[in-house]
């Protein structure tokens, strides 16, 4: 576990804040490279995944016990386990040794708005239809980036399935805020565009030394 990243998240923790991470894992690097046309310098994006901070629970662990909401596809060969879709996870899941970048972003929300945001994330997480993570939609967004069609609905959009950045944006939309100011369709939301959004009033970044 990357203790530096865990400390970074713990220092800037608040329910409903947005977290971005960028890993050197080959699969995640492909996602970062696929967002190159969206970055200001044309280089690969720093980030491959986005999620929301949830609650801090006294669960007896010594790692801060921070929980997050995310949409992800997680396959564990060692545990013979597949987790697909919107889920609640512990933030240590993303405190990886191969992490190169991390960020925490926040809006100036009232306590009522912050509570409503977490409640919306909980609603999606435990929705009886079980919202899944759409691998096809990921490729649809990469296609939209290349073809300049981000403002169009994702060509592989699936009902009851959302990408990580789309999930984060939907939670904010659910409380009357949109964190993306451009014309990008919700189904094509990317971690890179979230990172560039001017709406955030709180911003802290971490970079691997």
Regions found by a protein language model. Give the residues of each.
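Cysteine-nucleophile amide-bond enzymes
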Residues: 1-209
């Amino acid at each position: 576990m990357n203790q530096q990243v865990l400390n970074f998240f713990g220092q800037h923790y608040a329910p409903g804040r947005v977290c971005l991470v960028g890993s050197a894992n080959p699969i995640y690097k492909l996602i970062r490279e696929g967002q190159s046309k969206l970055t200001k310098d044309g280089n690969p994006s720093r980030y491959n995944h986005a999620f929301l901070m949830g609650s801090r629970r006294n669960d007896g662990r010594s790692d801060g016990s921070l929980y997050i909401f995310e949409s992800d596809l997680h396959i564990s060969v060692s545990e013979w386990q597949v987790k697909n879709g919107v889920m609640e996870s512990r933030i240590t899941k993303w405190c990886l040794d191969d992490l190169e970048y991390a960020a925490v972003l926040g809006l100036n929300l009232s306590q009522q708005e912050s509570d409503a945001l977490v409640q919306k994330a909980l609603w999606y997480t435990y929705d009886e239809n079980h919202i899944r993570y759409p691998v096809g939609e990921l490729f649809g967004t990469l296609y939209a980036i290349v073809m300049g069609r981000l403002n169009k609905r994702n060509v592989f959009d699936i009902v009851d399935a959302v990408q990580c950045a789309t999930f984060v944006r939907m939670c904010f939309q659910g409380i009357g805020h949109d964190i993306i100011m451009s014309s990008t369709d919700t189904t094509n939301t990317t971690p890179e565009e979230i990172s560039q959004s001017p709406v955030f009033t709180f911003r802290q970044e971490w970079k691997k030394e």
